[in-house]
Amino acid sequence: MTDQPILMFDSGVGGLTVLREARVLMPDRRFVYVADDAAFPFGAWEEPALRTHILDLFVKLLDRFAPAISVIACNTASTLVIDALRERFPGHPFVGTVPAVKPAAERTRSGLVSVLATPGTVKRQYTRDLISKWAQKCHVRLVGSDRLAGLAEVYMREGFVDEEAVRAEIAPCFMEHEGLRTDIVVLACTHYPFLVNRMRKTAPWPVDWIDPAEAIARRALSLLPPVDGALPQGEPDIAVFTSGKTDFAIGRLMQGFGLSVR
């Protein structure tokens, strides 16, 4: 079915950064955005419980929406459960979100790179394996932030954020060594690009902030079968919140992203 939607999954509103890029690349496609806000933040969960929760949830999501592809627009979930999802649902394509270590290693001039992520992503062996594979010649600092995802949620809902709190969370990313400075910070959580302007403002010096959203969207596009002619016009793009609870601010935010809350 060519009118099958693309499913975007995150713990909250962070995956909207990926949706935004996907819409540019796939303007004729229909999207279903699923925010598992009942389980937010994923980083607070024990790994086995979170893995089971997401696998069980996807049984329901795939049955309800029958998507053409599912994008796990969350680093914490992807590094934990993407392989298990592919094993559990072998006939369905999944696109994961992993820290953009390879492009960071290719771009850095100083060799000092920081990966800004949730504590869950920082502690995963998956993340360390990426560094070992792609950034052996770099000094990579893993920085786990307990607060940034929540600050991004507040910012997107309310339109303001405590800049001093942002400054404190990003401060460990900035290293100086033998006259060299950190020149790349990988945003390894899809929530973080919403705060990148505040990060630039509060950073001690300019760096290149790597947002993987476009690369994720391009990967999803590459896995979709080609379409002959125009796609049929069907249901509108929708947003689903697993808590079943949305307020005016969330409704307005989703509307701004062209999503109807269901």
Curated annotation (Swiss-Prot):
Upper taxonomic lineage: Bacteria, Pseudomonadati, Pseudomonadota, Alphaproteobacteria, Hyphomicrobiales
Pathway annotation from the record: Cell wall biogenesis; peptidoglycan biosynthesis
Job of this protein: Provides the (R)-glutamate required for cell wall biosynthesis.
GO molecular function term, any single one: glutamate racemase activity
Enzyme class: isomerase
Pfam family, one: Asp_Glu_race
Positions that bind substrate: D10, S11, F42, G43, N75, T76, T190, H191
Key words, A-Z: Cell shape, Cell wall biogenesis/degradation, Isomerase, Peptidoglycan synthesis
Active site: C74 (proton donor/acceptor), C189 (proton donor/acceptor)
Family, similarity comment: Belongs to the aspartate/glutamate racemases family.
Species for this entry: Mesorhizobium japonicum (strain LMG 29417 / CECT 9101 / MAFF 303099) (Mesorhizobium loti (strain MAFF 303099))
GO biological process, one term: cell wall organization
Catalytic reaction list: L-glutamate = D-glutamate
Gene3D superfamilies, per the entry: 3.40.50.1860
Protein name per its UniProtKB record: Glutamate racemase
PANTHER family membership: GLUTAMATE RACEMASE (PTHR21198:SF2)
EC number: 5.1.1.3
